[in-house]
């Protein structure tokens, strides 16, 4: 699982979900990628599920890069607890995703294999995303 080793503050405010991504909107490492077309939160479990779906399909061939990291804690109150009594305990970690952000990159495989691997990974994500490639722009 992707979680920070240590953080300065245990609990943080929820990040803003408005606006487009400022950086990380183009492919940096691989030939193919997944680009978010809408914003939202991505948990460490969702990132791991998408990574596993891709790597199982490409089977030893190719290389996968994860371009997002869940660095913000999300808190939650226990079930059946009364209202108030402060902020809940950190339960999981999230990455704030804005539209246009490249989430995963892939190289070393043919385009049809990459497209299918990315399709499987996109189904694991809670937001809309699209397949992009280095040569032809968006497909």
UniProtKB/Swiss-Prot annotation:
Is Ribonucleoprotein one of the keywords? yes
Basic residues compositional bias, start-end:
1-19
**CDD domains with a match to the protein in the record:** Ribosomal_L16_L10e
Q: Where is the signal peptide?
A: none
> Highest taxon of the source?
Bacteria
The record, for Pfam families, names: Ribosomal_L16
Q: From the UniProt record, which GO molecular function terms apply?
A: rRNA binding; structural constituent of ribosome; tRNA binding
Q: Which UniProt keywords apply?
A: Ribonucleoprotein, Ribosomal protein, RNA-binding, rRNA-binding, tRNA-binding
Q: Any keyword RNA-binding? A: yes
Q: Which InterPro entries match?
A: Ribosomal_uL16, Ribosomal_uL16_bact-type, Ribosomal_uL16_CS, Ribosomal_uL16_dom, Ribosomal_uL16_sf
Q: What does this protein do?
A: Binds 23S rRNA and is also seen to make contacts with the A and possibly P site tRNAs.
Checking HAMAP family in the record gives:
Ribosomal_uL16
Q: How does it assemble?
A: Part of the 50S ribosomal subunit.
Q: What NCBIfam families does this protein map onto?
A: rplP_bact
- Protein's recorded name: Large ribosomal subunit protein uL16
Species this protein is from: Cutibacterium acnes (strain DSM 16379 / KPA171202)
Which gene name belongs to this protein? rplP
């Amino acid at each position: 699982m992707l979680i920070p080793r240590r953080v300065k503050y245990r609990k943080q405010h929820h990040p803003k979900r408005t606006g487009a991504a400022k950086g990380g909107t183009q492919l940096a490492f691989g030939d193919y990628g997944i680009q978010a077309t809408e914003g939202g939160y991505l948990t460490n479990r969702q990132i791991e599920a998408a990574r596993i779906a891709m790597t199982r399909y490409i089977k030893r061939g190719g290389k996968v890069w994860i371009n997002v990291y869940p660095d913000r804690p999300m808190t939650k109150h226990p079930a059946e607890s009364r209202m108030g009594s402060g902020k809940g305990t950190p339960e999981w970690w999230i990455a704030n995703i804005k539209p246009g952000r490249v989430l995963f990159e892939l190289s070393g495989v043919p385009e049809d294999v990459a497209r299918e691997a990315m399709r499987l990974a996109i189904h694991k994500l809670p937001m809309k995303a699209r397949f992009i490639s280095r040569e032809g722009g968006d497909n």
